Structures are given as C-alpha cells and as structure tokens.
Amino acid sequence: MQKMPSQILNDGSSVSLNSASMNMANTPNSITVKTAYNGQIIITTINKNISYEELCYEIRNICRFPLDQPFTIKWVDEENDPCTISTKMELDEAIRLYEMNFDSQLVIHVFPNVPQAPGLSCDGEDRSIYRRGARRWRKLYRVNGHIFQAKRFNRRAFCAYCQDRIWGLGRQGFKCIQCKLLVHKKCHKLVQKHCTDQPEPLVKERAEESSDPIPVPLPPLPYEAMSGGAEACETHDHAHIVAPPPPEDPLEPGTQRQYSLNDFELIRVIGRGSYAKVLMVELRRTRRIYAMKVIKKALVTDDEDIDWVQTEKHVFETASNHPFLVGLHSCFQTPSRLFFVIEFVRGGDLMYHMQRQRRLPEEHARFYAAEISLALNFLHEKGIIYRDLKLDNVLLDHEGHIKLTDYGMCKEGIRPGDTTSTFCGTPNYIAPEILRGEDYGFSVDWWALGVLLYEMLAGRSPFDLAGASENPDQNTEDYLFQVILEKTIRIPRSLSVRAASVLKGFLNKNPADRLGCHRESAFMDIVSHPFFKNMDWELLERKQVTPPFKPRLDSDRDLANFPPEFTGEAVQLTPDDDHVIDNIDQSEFEGFEYVNPLLMSLEDCV
C-alpha cells in the first residue's frame, strides 16, 4: 500500500450512481465516513462496495468542487498516517483495513490540489492535522444533499420530520446550512426529502400548543444539606428540601435576584488560561470573597466552544455543595463577557505546593488520592467524565481538604456502558485508550489519578526518561505519547509495596483491567485496596478526617499560595470594543444567568 501522495485528476465525466451507495442509513453494508476539508468535517455514509468513481463523485459534491477541479483524497490509517486513495485497489484496501480493525468510521482528508511531484505533500497539507484532536474542525453531517450542523435552539423550534419540539441540554437539533431545515439530532438520518438549497418554511406551531411551557431542567439537588440551612429528608435522587428561613430583604413574588458586575469589587488576578482570566472578588452586599472566572464571548463563538461553556456551567451546578468539588455561586453576562462566580479556594493548588516540596509523604498522598477518588466517583455517578485531572486542578481549601476545579473538559450524559471518543486532555495525563483512538469511558479518570498519585509519591512524572531533556527528539508531544503507549512504567523502589500496587492498578494500560474500572465492583475496588486499608471513607466523605497539611493563611483574602506572576497583574478588565460586540451572536448565550439557591439562602441569612 502506497503511503505517498499521488495525483487524482477527475475528468468530470458523469457517473451513474447507485442510490444505495450514498447517504444510506446505517446498515450492515454501510460505512460512516468523516471527510475533513477546509476546516470542516462532513459526516456521511457509503456502501462498502462503492466504486472509486462513485467515491470521487461524492467527494466532489461534498466539497462543491467544479468539474475541472483536481483534488487529492487521503485516508488515515490506524497509525494516523495518510494514505492516498487514487485507484479502486487503494479504496478496497482502506475498506478492508477499516473492517479488519473494527473501526467506527473511515477518516479521509481532501485537498483541492495535487502534489507538484510524487513524494511531496499537497498545498496546505500539514502532518499535524492527522493527529486526532490536533485542531478544531467544524463538524457537518451530509444526508440527501442536506448539510446539517448541530445547533442549540434557544427559542421554540419543531422538527420537520417528527413535528415534535426540539429542546434539551446541549445541541439537540440539526439545522441544514443550505435550506435551513430543522430536525432532531435523532431524526436527521431519517430525512427523505432532498435539499433544495432554498430555505424551507418553518414548521408552524400548533395553536393548542402555543401556550405550553418549554420544559426546563430542574436545578440539581445539593450533595448534602448545608449546616444551618435546609434540612433534607432521606437521601435519594428526589429528596425534598425544607424551605430556608425567609431572607432579610425578601424579593418580590415570582422574581429571582440576578447579579451583575456592579455587585462585585475586583481585587486581584489569581489565574489565567487560554480562554479565561480568574479574579478574586468581593460581593459588596455581604463582603464575602469569591473567585470570578471571566470569559470573552469573542473567544467562544464557535459551536464547540459554546458547548464547552454550557458544559462547564452544568457541571458547576451539579458539583455545587459537594465537599470536594468547587461549586457555583452565580452566572451573569455583559455584551462582551461571561462571568462564573465560584467558590474561592484559598489554599493554592497541588502544583504550587509540589513545586516547593518536590514529593509528598505517603500518608499525605493517600489522603489527597482518597478525597479525589470520592470527587471522581460522584461525577461518574452523575454521568460525567472529568477528563482533566492534574495537579493544577486540585485545590486545597483553608483546612487542607481538596477541591477539584475547571470543568471545561467534562463529558456529560455518560450512562453505564456508554463511551465517547473525543481526543482531549493534558498530554502528560492522557490515557492510552485515548491515544489509541479507542472509544472510552470513566477509565480515563482513574488513569489520570494514577499519574497524579505517582507525581505526588515520586516527585516526577511516570513518563520522565533519563537524558530526555538533552535530546530534542524526546521532548516532543508525539514522543511523550509513544512513551505512554509503549514504555513500561517503573515504580521507585523507595515506595511501599502497597503504594507500588495501587500505582500499578491505576496505571494499567488496559482499561478493562485498570483499578476502578471493573463493571461490577468499580469504585469498591479502590475503597478496598490495601493502600487505603486504614482510611475511614464515611468520615472522609463528611470531612471529619483531619488533613495532613493545613495551608498557612492570615485571612480569607490571603494570597500567599497563589503565584505572584498572576497576583501582580492589573485587575481591570479591558474596555469593550463595539465592533467586536456587534459581531457576537448574543442569542447563543440566552439563559446563561444562574443563581445557586442554597448559597442565596445562606447569604440572605447573613
């Protein structure tokens, strides 16, 4: 099989297509194809017996190439290498390997040119695009000529196929970018009508439904009743909460207090990421200290970025009032920014403390690993994969207990047995199954905990190799991934037998055999592991086990545990740019506002 570019110059002759070869529903003979072109991914299905000419015809239609446009087709093999398809033989080989490897889809890349000579790359071809997750692609779905894009509809919308309302968390609807047809995500493959490239009339609302309220998800119940606040009945998913005492300044009936930037005093910058700035702020009315995550809307106008913000908000709401997860106070927005007001955890993160201590005593690492395990298990029980466990995201509160933060990488809606496939995470913590391109579930969080526990106990990453820093070829992300996949992890001899055992359990490259991943026993395997033998898990969950380390803090505003490169920054927000605001679709952020009712009750009683 040839793995170098070769020329594909279609002569534009008409091809008589078997209708069963294209845009077919999922059948035993169908193959899902992801075609990457011009920053977009178009998803369609083909018959596995498709001819090379039929494939070229389909690609020409998908990419809207004129008849005289030459182009190059490359499929990506199991090693993420590009292989040119220029003949029926090469197409058959791609399909054969697709079936042999039990792949879920055939990934191809299209370039609107041909190489200048055999062995050269196409114009615009970069090897990095073949690594899963290396760049963001706009994902489209092609069915009967429709080019569907997943959308979240903030206003009332109805499916053109089943006539039912489109609603729910995330992007539940698909919209054709050509004819504007609206359908459910679940219905898009069933659409029989071909796209006309002309806008379709909207499905009219039925008169008898016009006054129906749009279903709204109920706010999550608290993890446990807060002291001095509401008392919960028997703990279960639908426990009733007794109303708290009336606030000192009661609101008008039917209204809910909303917050704005004017309600807060901005004090210091305490963190910064690629999307957001984090500030320490004071709520003027109560003088309570919070952290405020500030995100510029102009940076999240892409659909997938907007989903990331919505996911983080949903997980913040779910996590509120859990002892080991950072909770949400409120959300609000301005024309240019989104604001998350969250708990201020002032003890610093584990990365900050590890840089000063290098390694931790085993009893310290055991305590932190146990509290992290409880937090991860709670998320898993709620159908959430965390996917970004690392030292930076483990905070210490003023007493020394941990709290996980930063939920932007989370995946929601995972039921037992469900999997996902997105390539994401921090490179040093990415699990082997993600690197292999396999579908995965909660197993990736337990792998990351193994990496983090190794770092706490050994003072270094399990994937650090002697002499690697002196060799530029071994300082690349690809080399790190190769080490994670192939190298045997060496446990320091200085660690106890129990510590070595738990590390080997978490760092098993086979997720089916990994500690915490057995379908029946799952979390109980962690609880009963000898490394945690003396841990009282019930007391731990109630925060009644004394932490091994208590951060030194002079006040609730003490920033001694935060890096000075952040705290020394100017705290002011940059002025709004009217031109930038004019280009923001504000409808994408409708309904972002939120107030945590339990925290509100606590504040009102102050």
Curated annotation (Swiss-Prot):
A zinc finger (Phorbol-ester/DAG-type) spans 145-195. Transmembrane segments: none annotated. GO terms for biological process: adherens junction organization; apical protein localization; asymmetric neuroblast division; asymmetric protein localization involved in cell fate determination; branching involved in open tracheal system development; cell-cell junction assembly; compound eye retinal cell programmed cell death; epithelial cell morphogenesis. GO terms for cellular component: apical cortex; apical junction complex; apical plasma membrane; apicolateral plasma membrane; cell cortex; PAR polarity complex; subapical complex. Keywords: ATP-binding, Cell membrane, Cytoplasm, Kinase, Membrane, Metal-binding, Nucleotide-binding, Phosphoprotein, Serine/threonine-protein kinase, Transferase, Zinc, Zinc-finger. It is a peripheral membrane protein. CDD domains: C1_aPKC, PB1_aPKC, STKc_aPKC. Coiled coil: none annotated. InterPro entries: AGC-kinase_C, Atypical_PKC, C1-like_sf, DAG/PE-bd, Kinase-like_dom_sf, PB1-like, PB1_aPKC, PB1_dom. Interacts with baz; the interaction is required for apical localization of aPKC in neuroblasts and epithelial cells. Interacts with Dap160; the interaction promotes aPKC apical localization and kinase activity. Interacts with and phosphorylates l(2)gl and yrt. Interacts with crb and ref(2)P. Forms a complex with baz, fz and Patj. Serine/threonine protein kinase which is required for apico-basal cell polarity in the germ line as well as in epithelial and neural precursor cells, for epithelial planar cell polarity and for cell proliferation. During oocyte development, required for the posterior translocation of oocyte specification factors and for the posterior establishment of the microtubule organizing center within the presumptive oocyte. Phosphorylates l(2)gl which restricts l(2)gl activity to the oocyte posterior and regulates posterior enrichment of par-1, leading to establishment of correct oocyte polarity. This is Atypical protein kinase C. It comes from Drosophila melanogaster.
